[in-house]
């Protein structure tokens, strides 16, 4: 997935790692700033159980009324075989993954995923490549929505920062741990947590910032992010090493 690259042009000199199709370096450094990432582990997917009209499999129930699915035809190309065409039903909660049309009360499972909401991060990559200080990095990170990443950054002026860059759903009810009834309207997403309200740090008191796919918000944070944090072993060890009394140097980190 990742490719190492060094991009040089009259207005750009940036090195790091990127992905095919990304407009520049996704994580790395230029002459002024450096940035890296770990996974936020954000839960940005919910599953909705839809009630299907027994008289019309292309309709589903929502708040007492049948709504028409949007039908999209996709062509799956298979090496050495004829292409296969499939129809996908789209609901207000997302595409239908599977259905159960047996019996008098057929149902289907729809998936609501932040990636299907047209969010993107391409502009963030471009602006990060041109940033000259942590303030400009933070401005660039406003456009980093997917995939959800913990971005740590520093500039040559000695400033450091961290921002939770992820599309964190604001759920009307529940935490998305289990499939929910799609027909009630009680479990809708009300958008995403604004950039300024996501966990972040600028020049914190300890003088360093560490992240290792661990929990990024305290218990009193008002928005649900995830249940799926990695174990604390790595972040605990990082804190132990960084809090040591011995002086840390570039050679020591190597």
Regions found by a protein language model. Give the residues of each.
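Mature extracytoplasmic enzyme cores
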Residues: 1-254
């Amino acid at each position: 997935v990742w490719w190492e690259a060094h991009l040089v042009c009259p207005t750009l000199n940036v090195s790091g790692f990127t992905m095919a199709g990304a407009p520049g370096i996704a994580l790395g450094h230029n002459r002024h700033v450096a940035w890296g990432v770990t996974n936020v582990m954000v839960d940005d997917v919910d599953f909705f159980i839809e009630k299907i009209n027994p008289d019309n499999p292309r309709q589903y129930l929502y708040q007492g009324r049948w709504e028409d699915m949007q039908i999209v035809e996709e062509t799956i190309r298979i090496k050495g075989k004829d292409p296969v065409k499939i129809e996908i039903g789209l609901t207000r909660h997302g595409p239908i993954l599977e259905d159960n049309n047996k019996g008098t009360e057929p149902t289907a499972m729809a998936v609501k995923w932040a990636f299907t909401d047209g969010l993107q991060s391409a502009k963030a990559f471009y602006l990060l490549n041109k940033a000259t200080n942590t303030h400009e990095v933070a401005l660039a990170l406003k456009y980093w929505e997917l995939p959800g990443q913990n971005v740590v950054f520093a500039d040559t002026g000695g400033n450091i920062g961290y921002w939770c860059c992820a599309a964190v759903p604001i759920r009307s009810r529940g935490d998305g741990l289990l499939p929910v009834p799609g027909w009630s309207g009680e479990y809708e997403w009300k958008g995403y947590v604004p950039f300024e309200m996501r966990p972040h740090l600028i020049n914190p008191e300890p003088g360093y910032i560490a992240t290792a796919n661990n929990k990024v918000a305290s218990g009193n944070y008002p928005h649900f992010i995830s249940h799926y944090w990695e174990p604390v072993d790595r972040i605990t060890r990082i804190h132990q090493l960084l809090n040591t009394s011995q002086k840390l140097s570039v050679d020591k980190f190597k």
